[in-house]
């Protein structure tokens, strides 16, 4: 099991912080970006860097990878995705998803840890909601109204689960403990174990007359709306925590939290890597040969760029401060303009004659038969 390869790809150790991982990712991503590095194998390296960062930038995926290696990333070791077409899902309880030795021993001996008071206040479950953002919305920030269903305290009983005018009583069978002792035959002999009370189902309370609204649960599903202020510069996969916007707590406990996860749509014009933006600019070979001043689109509007004579395909120019806002820190990243020289396909007679004259003056023989020659110099 190799659980260090992803760290090696980014050039960090296993104890690296998220800021160190992100900084290393930016460096390696720029080093192997296909538009900036034309060496053989650079694109594969770039994909490997993306794969490593996708896992190590997510705390749940990273924890699974640290423990199980590649199997933890691909297998069912928790760290679920988004729920449903609405982009909403719950995180479930706060007890975690893994069983351990305590679970094994408790199946025989009934316990193995401190007893939990069933009447103690407990925080409600956290929820997760995915927000789809347009490319420009992620760049500049936006306000979104998020509507989802969550568990709130029953408006009839106020969370007690009992019919109006009545109150829950201490369970007569378990005495309010939520568990009862049971004698069982096990492979180790006859053992006394503890199990969840079959009367109160672990709550320690009996409700003689249940609320007709929540049927004794104390909660009801309610459509809830919250305003989300999306900060400028967010990226796909980043999360935003909204405290107290999750499910209602139990026994007077606080509400859980809502985690908003951002999904940014791709642009048909730009590529983005953190705060850096890349734009492939098609350019006529005459402009590239003679030099020109051109208008370049950016997310901040068009800007003028001087192209020096003799510019080749793959040349890149930096437009300082024309990238995305830096989510941590101040200012913007840069935009990189990558030149893609276009050879004309359909030329009129005057254009052909002009190029033939240029070829002759350059000492280049052009057969016109489609063989490699003059035009290949501009590809």
From Swiss-Prot:
Q: Does the keyword Metal-binding apply?
A: yes
GO MF terms here are: ATP binding; heat shock protein binding; unfolded protein binding; zinc ion binding
Checking PROSITE patterns in the record gives: DNAJ_1, DNAJ_2, ZF_CR
Which cofactor does the UniProt annotation name? Zn(2+)
User: How many cofactor units bind, and how?
Assistant: Binds 2 Zn(2+) ions per monomer.
Instruction: Offer one Pfam family short name for this entry.
Output: DnaJ_C
One GO CC term, this protein: cytoplasm
What residues does the J domain cover? Answer: 5-69
Positions annotated to bind Zn(2+) 1: 154, 157, 214
Which amino acid positions bind Zn(2+) 2, per UniProt? 171, 174, 197, 200
UniProt-listed SUPFAM superfamilies: Chaperone J-domain (SSF46565), DnaJ/Hsp40 cysteine-rich domain (SSF57938), HSP40/DnaJ peptide-binding domain (SSF49493)
Gene3D superfamilies the UniProt entry points to: DnaJ domain, Heat shock protein DnaJ, cysteine-rich domain, Urease metallochaperone UreE, N-terminal domain
GO terms under biological process = chaperone cofactor-dependent protein refolding; DNA replication; protein refolding; response to heat
On whether Chaperone is a keyword of this UniProt record, the answer is yes
Report the superkingdom from the record: Bacteria
Its quaternary organisation is: Homodimer.
HAMAP family found in the cross-reference section: DnaJ
Q: What does this protein do?
A: Participates actively in the response to hyperosmotic and heat shock by preventing the aggregation of stress-denatured proteins and by disaggregating proteins, also in an autonomous, DnaK-independent fashion. Unfolded proteins bind initially to DnaJ; upon interaction with the DnaJ-bound protein, DnaK hydrolyzes its bound ATP, resulting in the formation of a stable complex. GrpE releases ADP from DnaK; ATP binding to DnaK triggers the release of the substrate protein, thus completing the reaction cycle.
Which family does the similarity line name?
Answer: Belongs to the DnaJ family.
The protein here is known as Chaperone protein DnaJ
